[in-house]
Amino acid sequence: MIKKTVFSLAILASSAFAHSAIMNCFDNGDGTITCEGGFSDGSSASGVYFIIEQNGKEIFGTKMNENSEVTFKKPNGDFRAILDAGEGHEVYIKSKDITQ
């Protein structure tokens, strides 16, 4: 009985981490940034909320398109891009980490 319980808990714990949110952003070199999102299990981030935050305030918000992408005008100064797929499934990328 104990072995079955431990095995069941291990299966449940592994499935809880089966789909971590992932995102990559790159500078297009034309004054815009493109961010691509998804999940570690290969599922789409289409429709997932995306935010640009600057100085602790949301300056842009939208949802990932059907290709799990968002392209936006590059803000002046430091900012961070946030993929918000719900509690425990957020990804934060600082502007200094976005390269061309």
Model regions and ranges:
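Short, aromatic- and glycine-rich surface loops/edge beta-strands on solvent-exposed regions
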Residues: 77-89
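Short amphipathic beta-strand segments in non-cytosolic proteins
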Residues: 49-61
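Sec-dependent N-terminal signal peptides
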Residues: 5-13
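Short solvent-exposed capping/turn motifs at the termini of beta-strands
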Residues: 37-41
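Glycine-centered loop-to-beta-strand initiation motif
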Residues: 63-72
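Beta-strand-rich domain onsets/edges
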Residues: 17-33, 54-56, 95-100
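Short beta-strand/loop motifs in extracellular/secreted proteins, especially
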Residues: 46-48, 79
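Periplasmic N-terminal soluble interaction domains immediately after the signal peptide in Gram-negative
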Residues: 70, 76-79, 95-98
